[in-house]
Amino acid sequence: SYGDENHDRYDSYYKNKTFSTSFKTNLKVSLESLYQEVKNSIVNDKISIVLLDDRSLSSSEKLIPMPLAIGYINQHLKSDNVRQSVSIVAVTGEVYDPHSAAVLIAFGATAIYPYMMYSSVISHNERKNLSEKALIKKIKNTQISINGGLMKIMSKMGIATVASYRNSSLFDVIGLSDEIISDCFEKANSDLAGLCYEDIEKRIELSHFDAFVNDKTMFPLEMGGIYKYIDGGEYHDFGPAITKAINHTKDLKGLKTLIEGRDKKFIRDFFDFKSDKKEISIDNVESKNEIFKRFAAAAMSCGSISVEAHEAIAIAMNTIGGSSNSGEGGEDAARFGTLKNSKIKQVASGRFGVTPAYLRSADELQIKVAQGAKPGEGGQLPGSKVNAMIATLRHTTEGVTLISPPPHHDIYSIEDLAQLIFDLKQVNPKATVTVKLVSTIGVGTIAAGVAKAYADKIIISGADGGTGAAPLTSIKHTGNAWELGLAEAHNSLKANHLREMVHVQADGGLKTGIDVVKAAMLGAESYAFGTPLLTILGCKILRICHTNKCSVGVATQNEELREKFSGTVERLIEYFDFLAQDVRE
């Protein structure tokens, strides 16, 4: 390379040195040792490019996680005023998707060589006897896909170039100790501490054992199950057991047993009730009919889910006195004024389906600033789901993919939001106006601003909510648990003497009465449910909503598949009846 002093075209600008990120014991000491080695080479050898390489993994050598290595070295080089002298390149097998690349760049990496990802592409295609040119094309396509994902991540934050995104630290860090945050991710937001260096090293040792010693695993590489449930892999709350329990609505006590028996998978699972009050008769507790009024269906558009599912939810919610939500896809005017009418009409950045008649048919108008399933992005409906009817409802063209802009282009300040709230109240003076926010660190400040803009209700949407149309890259690593955002918003509103002005709602993964009660104790006054309702209507959690191939007719516009829809209004009502009774008990 041009950085090799023995090369004919040597240029000191490219002078580089490779540093292994392997270690034997003591993660923290190894990080500091690696940093000192890097710093000495920069100061003494005048290198311009630092290559952090994790290809030296062996039976005796473990690897420092690349985000820790990048973050630690980048941060300490800046502290010692030598960061500007070098570029940091990560030669790593840890980057396999846009998120993992974004983490390294945001915490200081200048460039990334994801060798394992490229090797996987070659390995996957070598059996097809492709020409060298075709194989190179596959690798380039992979690179284009990762770059496209990076651009989407940057666009969510309003950033146009990688140079601006680098060193931005635009992440909320959940579950790492204050010491690690201070050492490696100083500028990142962190509200919930957790693993220390010793804890991470134990996990590294376990993975190392599985790779080099444990011969009882079924596959050479663990499948993981990040997006889809795999037995023994990543935990999914809507796994087979809970999905089956929800489907058996006549015995929802089984669902309650599963939820309460899970091993602390969510923040709320760490909360135990503490009270010195004596039990009271259930006859003295708020009635089911009153509790029903606090229940809402989460926003799911007629388009992301089928007409049959959308109408069943609306009828069920209207029957019990709750509220269904149209989502951002408009609604058939023939449903207005009937049991099929959604009390909540959503107004999103794309304004799909928004007409004066649509707005005046609502009891509540919901401005979607963000949603838990894919915060920072607008709604997305693949063209395959936009049939003639959906196109008519949304006033668009059949077969064309519909993507709402990430921001509302008429909202760039609290004053702009106040203007939209005012305009909506002029169209429908009887409706309450709500603003939907996503749970994130700092949402409390935003909630206070929304209250000052005269919104009637604020919704805190958690990351555990589902989605009927989002691509896979939007499902993971976006948004925080509603528990964090709800507590922050509630406390911020109280601190600013605004809490009594607004109603607060929580949504995102609520399933049982204990979830509702814990949300209430954190400040929520009403509660929205999405995925459980679709599961009751027949959803099998296949995670193919975006393909328009839902085999049970819940999340598809394919007429043949919609004929297989077997959900009923009665089953939904049974679920909410169980839920309200569970809350009372």
Regions found by a protein language model. Name each.
Residues S326, K343-I344, G378, I414, ...:
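Iron-sulfur-associated redox domains of electron-transfer enzymes in respiratory
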Residues D4-K28, H76-S79, K288-E290, A296-A297, ...:
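N-terminal small/glycine-rich loop or linker at the start of catalytic domains
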Residues N16-N147, I153-V162, D172, S177, ...:
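Glycine-rich phosphate/ribose-binding loops and adjacent secondary-structure elements
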Residues S1-K28, E37-S41, I47-I49, S100-A101, ...:
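Flexible, glycine-rich loop/tail regions that form catalytic "lids" or insertion modules at the edges
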Residues L561-Q581:
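Anionic ligand-binding catalytic core segments
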Residues G378-Q380, K540:
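Short conserved micro-motifs at the rims of enzyme active sites and ligand-binding pockets
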Residues T401-P407, K564-S566:
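Short glycine/proline- and acidic residue-enriched helix-loop micro-motifs
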